[in-house]
Amino acid sequence: MRRILYLEPVGGIAGDMFLAAGLDLGISPAELERALSGLRVPGWKLAVSRAVRHAISGTHLDVVLDAREAHPHRAYADIRRLIEEADTLPPRAKERALAVFRAIGEAEAKVHGVSIDDIHFHEVGAVDSIVDICGAAVVLELLGNPEVHAAPPPLGSGTIRVAHGAMPIPVPATLELLRDVPVRFEGVGELTTPTGAALLKVLAHIGHPPDFIVEKVGYGVGTKDFKDRPNVLRASLGRLEQASNEGLWVVEANLDDATPQLLGHLLERLLAVGALDAWVTPVVMKKSRPGHLLSALVEGGTREAIVDVVLRESTTLGVRYHRVERQALERDWVEVETPWGKVRVKRGLRQGAVLNAHPEFEDCRQVAEAAGVPVKQVMAAAVAALGPKD
């Protein structure tokens, strides 16, 4: 079963908000701390509390540092070694955390015009940021490794003072991390931090999630209190009702230059490949040109094979498909006796009652040819032999 985690950075995203949202979904703080205990960084603990922002209640998390711990400027190689040597981190969590730090390092290197090996992390190299990023990787592990999707994050505006001095918001590293993905330029102050941006870039697909059934909702509350929005990250965890290729689908394409011979061939091919039904509808297309709409009703497992036939063997440049639902009568076959021989009849039933009945045409044709009578006469006799509908 596919699991989905959908993140909505209503008031932005930071590393501590990601962890807090995971805890609000039900993750045990003690279990999270155990997984992070192998990090060889001194003087930290998790402080978990309830908080409210704009009438939304959620979990707030602080990484509380030992007062004696300085904030060293760690190099990328130092952080990589810390993560690799943490024997309590699950292997997949290590891979994710390393990927997030590498993304941050590459963004910082691009901004400063140096090699990643020459980068020394300042705020992101501090103990709390290391715990945030490794903790986010552990959160996904404890949630069962769901697919992560996220809404476009708001970036904020203004300026902020960091180790390098005053910087515009979003800071250069944040914007570099979120190149080529949808974002929102709105809000006042720093709504999305470099750590939050890196978590989204590496761990999530930014855009609309697939339709899914929401089972749990958690709110990670940040440290800020914005006037225009709650500083919360909403996390919805659930499951897909069905895989995207299940159920019934209609595959269709518009054709403006298909010959009758080609249309007939396409219908035969679609049915041969596994379409439940296939048909052609006359349509009027752009510039008032007559054309044809080629359609096929298919089960999800054969959808891609049907799409392949349409693209390979028709003249279309594209294919559409959409999910459909249907109600069908139960069906069975009975054999009836006519004055000229036996004929099969297909019946449609609902709750045991016969609603429709259709003699098998090929049976009727063969009997009619052998007896020298019209086919319609055999068909009428077959229906009469079936008796009244029950």
Curated annotation (Swiss-Prot):
Source organism phylogeny: Bacteria, Pseudomonadati, Myxococcota, Myxococcia, Myxococcales
Protein family: Belongs to the LarC family.
Keywords from the UniProt entry: Nickel
GO molecular function: lyase activity; nickel cation binding
UniProt name for this protein: Putative nickel insertion protein
Any one Pfam family match given in the protein's UniProt record, by short name: Ni_insertion
Source taxon at top rank: Bacteria
Organism field: Myxococcus xanthus (strain DK1622)
PANTHER family cross-referenced by the UniProt entry: NICKEL INSERTION PROTEIN-RELATED, PYRIDINIUM-3,5-BISTHIOCARBOXYLIC ACID MONONUCLEOTIDE NICKEL INSERTION PROTEIN
Alphabetical list of HAMAP family matching this protein: LarC (MF_01074)
Listed InterPro entries: Ni_insertion
